[in-house]
Amino acid sequence: AIVSSPEIAPIYAEAFGIGESRIKPIGTPRTDVFFDCDYVAAAKERLYSQYPLLRGKKICLFAPTFRGANVHDAEYPESFFDCEKFANALGTDWAVIIKMHPFIKKPVQIPKSVSNRVFDLSTEREINDILFITDVLVTDYSSVIFENAVIGNACVLYAPDLEQYTDGRGFYFDYSDYSCGSVVYSFSELPQAVLAAKPGEAQRKFKERFVSLCDGNSSARFVETILESKK
């Protein structure tokens, strides 16, 4: 198995019940594309061409994980996020992109009053492409925080149901360990947290701990590891 940093190797070994010597901290090959300037530029241009109202805006990506046991009952409670109030609180300099988990099939209801500033991109296959045009990521318990840390965007964690979610699924680490920016627990706190968000020391430490080897060379290290194992 391969992991994205040396520090999490013991966690993976325990989780999968294998010896730590079989865990290779070499980075995540799929993140190498983040360092491909041509790919990033093309992804940005594709999104701006498809959604021209995003051009010139600061962009907040709202990308929560699903609630429920599986794909059949997956949802995100509407009471957690009011896109109209959120967009109005951020102001007209901002655009809000909503990217729901693929398990959630119900389209996001966007009021006409903010339809020029709030966009449902849940059908976009690659959330990472959206991260390339993002200024601030808002998520909760999603693994997108790791890709976002590699790219270097600011991040706000919004966890209105932390206790309930922890009881139901749990985490490998304490939730506070995943903090790569500010953490808020109520919707009323969220807009100001986004407006104040910027990459900082917390994000640097998070990146060093969890994704330090995602540096654009993970695929090369993966090939080297395979070749070494054949000797």
Outline where the language-model segments fall:
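C-terminal alpha-helical cap of glycosyltransferases
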Residues: 215-231
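Short, well-ordered beta-strand core segments
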Residues: 1, 137-138, 155
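Conserved catalytic-core segment of nucleotide-activated headgroup transferases in glycan assembly
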Residues: 23, 29-110, 184
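Catalytic binding pocket for nucleotide-activated donors in carbohydrate/polymer assembly enzymes
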Residues: 19-20, 111-116, 143-210
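Donor nucleotide-activated moiety binding/catalytic core segment of transferases
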Residues: 97, 102-146
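Active-site-proximal region of nucleotide-activated glycan assembly enzymes
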Residues: 1-41
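Short, well-ordered alpha-helix to beta-strand connector turns
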Residues: 9, 20, 93-94, 115, ...
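Helix N-cap/beta->alpha junction signal
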Residues: 4-7, 100-102, 141, 186
